[in-house]
Amino acid sequence: MFATISALRDISRRCLAAEPLTPEQSQLLAVSLTRFIQRDCPSLEAALGLRFPRGGVPWWREEAIRKRNAALRDLAAQFCDGHAVSAQAHRIWLLTSRYAASTWRFDRERTAMPDAYAGTEKQYVWIAFRSGAPMPVCERHLRTILGR
């Protein structure tokens, strides 16, 4: 599924840049659109093979959660290394809660991270919030994320 998403992103990039598609990309689009138009599939997602189990997490949310969790793990590795997972979770919960209450309301409109955040804790916090996954995360859930 993630290979298909990657291929679709490349197709999108090529279309926006007015670059020609590869034969494989053209084939993927043609077959998928034909399946959708002929009503062989109930949605474009199904036609493209982007399926998730009934009641499961949609692919776009799963991707956002993976990005968020990676940013939170990187934050812990860079700035909380050597501390117990519970201490890391508490520190990150404080950072993200404060950020949510103060700065995120301004930063959410930005498409690029502020330069001042580079190399700081806020860099990883901004990435986690920008991922699109629910934030801030409670301490208990942070312990689960950081424990992996």
Residue ranges and their predicted role:
Residues 1-110, 115-124, 130-147:
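Low-complexity, PEST-like segments
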